[in-house]
Each structure stands twice: as C-alpha cells, then as structure tokens.
C-alpha cells in the first residue's frame, strides 16, 4: 500500500475478541504449500510430510493477555488508482487513489458478526517516504481476511440493474424471453449447446471484484441504501467478491482461463466475504467524504 511512513496506520479500536486465531504468515505459507503440491505434474497433491505441515499451519494461536480494546492493525484490502480504473467514482477534491482496509474479525455491529471497513482517499503524488513494513495483526479470525497480492487487469463492461429493481412489466418480458430460450435449447438436436443465457447471471451484474455499476441483492432483496448524513441515495463504489465467477456465472469466465482448473483461477485474491458472498460498498454521490455504507450478499 502507498502509505506515508509518518502517518498512523489504520487500526480497529472497537471492543471485540482479538486474542485467538490464525497467524497471517501461517495462512500465506499454507497457501504456498498447497499450491505447490497441486501444481506438480507427477503425483499431484500433498505428500504425507506436506499434510503434516499443513495441519500445523492451520492451528489457531492465542495471544496472552490480549485486551478487547488493544489497537488492532487493519489489513490492506484494495488499492485503486484512477489512472487504472476509469470508472472509479469521484473522490474528494483531486484525490486519485482509493485505499480500502478491513478489520480481520467478524465481530462488529449490534449482532457482533458484522465487518468493519476503513476507506481512505488520497493524492498519490503527495506521498513522500513510503511505509515499507506496515503493521500486521498477530492473528486473524479467518483466512479469508488475508488477501493475496494481485495485479489488476481492468475491463469495462456494461451492467444493468438487479432484476428485483426493474418495472414489473419489464421483468415479465425478461422472464418470457428466458423461458423461450430454455425451450429452444431443450428442443435443439445439438446436445453440446451451452446453457441458455439468463438476465441474472449472464447479462445484468457480473461476478467478481468490480468498481461502480449496479449492486446485486440476491441474498437480502433490495433495501434503501441512503447516505446517513444527507439522505441522498448512494451509488455503488466497489464490490469485493469471494470469487471471480462460479457455476452460475460461467459465461463471465475469461477466454484466457477457459482451459484452467476452476479452483486455480476463480479465487486469485483468496478473500472470502462472510459465507462465500460479496461485499458491496456504497458512497454518497453528493459528497464522497460522507461515511460509506455496505451490504453483504
């Protein structure tokens, strides 16, 4: 992360348990061992020795005398430059860099099971000496909080609103169109024909990490996402997804990855949101300084 050496690193100060979990270094090592084992051409898969090591790396550890209010370093989750992502919504002033952090424990909010995010806009050209060794939490609540570094290859696509937000008449037309495609596929003599396209998974909202566009509400159904400061309807800023595509959205699989095993190319970030969901982060279009909101789908 492009973080000034003289600027305090974001920390979670909310009171919650933080004294038991897996060590980030163990999580990264576990992934490396497993990836290496399955990449072998001969006898792929972990050896007995590797399985023993993997078991050790999966162990949870306790932090003696850890307080529920000790400053807990957040984990850098995403760093997006406007030069790389043309559709990145406007930040305050002439800021060109968005940085996203999260607390590595699901222990926030009234039910003590919510996420905690921290978003920071900055002007990249103002950063002088860069922090080379950011603080890390000693343990994390789950391995999905620890991202693997990835190089972005942004691609612009057209998105459309979630089906539940469309007018009823239009939804009925889409349903009839999908039924006609399914019937046509069933009657086709060509059994190699792929599954017919559908609005939900193939045409409206792509899976994976993305900036802008429309949010999916497939888990909760739509509900108002208005700014808590000025009541303005908020716009989707960023989607953080647990996978780049899945069985229901295979039409979005990149052509370059058509012949790669699914488990190797769908989760490059190794980030897991809740129970394999997606995190939609919203921003106020009138004032990007206003607090962000988010939903998990």
Annotated model-derived regions:
Residues 1-297:
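Preference for intrinsically disordered or flexible, low-complexity segments
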